[in-house]
Amino acid sequence: MSTIEWQSKAEVVYESILQGQILPLSNGGNSYDIQAALALSTCYRLTPSKEAILKINESFINYFIQSKLNNPSAEIIIREPYPIACGSYDSTKKYVGIVHHLDPVIENKSWKHRWYFNTLRKNLKKLDTTITVSEYWKDELIKIGANNVNVIYNSFDVSKYADDEIKNDFKEKHQIAIDKKLIYIGNASKEKGVYEVYEALKDQDYELIMSGPVNNAPNIPVKYVNLNKSEYIKMLKACDLTISMSKMIEGWNRIAHESLLCNTPVIGNGTGGMKELLKKGNQIIEHDYNQLPLAIEKVLDNRSYYTSEGYKFVRRFDLTYFNESWINLINQLK
């Protein structure tokens, strides 16, 4: 049986793998990575690397030095971006990289960020294979020289999103008007475009809601909720529509994906890999905030079509697909 070491700078990934479950503090990218590690641990001896964790207040230089000194004994090393950029490479081992997306805004923050992204791009060429989450990023990674790039899509336990009659229950619990259409505008942060969406819809007769572990958009009068996973799914089911106008170049878009699993249609701007999700799911792509009211009206007037088309596309990405894709990848690598 092959041995695998999973390298992530995020402590929540390390702890989740040890505990065999996705812990609540995991973000979307973390959740994908943990899910992949847990899938592989059913067939291989997989251990998470404590040495790869970026400690609180640890300098990047110290992290870089410690990463270079780390020489794991595992036959296969799976690396997230920080370990890809900072780790050493041994010709006797196989290396797999995971890249969800690259963010040019972060890259231009400082010389350290520019150095990191340049080194990451250079080291992508040293990997035996690179995994990403959309055709958009597969093309982008190939352009910068990554080897053997494969797409394994975000996937979910589809049974957890099975429809039930809880729409009014959620609204009553969170004191939301039952007689108004409820629209989810995404994570409460400016990077997700919530300010612009609010401005475009503030004069419309809709109830808006946003979520996340922290309200990073507290100065707009939009209802904010911090929900556990089961309540989050109930919220998506209670919504009549999800809007995703992200300013980031998305890897995919798990919010949009989960909305479609909940039979909630999506309007989005289709940045990065989100375009593939919305286009193949026959959802509306809209770049102009001022056109959102018309787009919303179109979707709500034909909601059954958009819910059916969206669910038909995303339901194929279940855990059977995901687990088999990762296990087959490693089998081919050996």
Predicted regions, residues:
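Carbohydrate-associated surface elements
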Residues: 136, 155
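Acidic anion/phosphate-binding donor-loop and adjacent secondary structure
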Residues: 156-173
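Membrane-proximal helix-turn-helix segments that form the acceptor-binding/catalytic region
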Residues: 110-130
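Conserved acidic donor-binding segment of nucleotide-sugar-dependent glycosyltransferases
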Residues: 280-290, 297-303
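Nucleotide-sugar-dependent
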Residues: 244-254, 270, 275-276
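Short hydrophobic beta-strand element within catalytic cores of glycosyltransferases
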Residues: 265-268
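A charged, aromatic-enriched C-terminal amphipathic alpha-helix characteristic of glycosyltransferases
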Residues: 28-31, 301-333
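Conserved donor-binding/catalytic core segment of Leloir-type glycosyltransferases
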Residues: 176-192, 198-203, 209
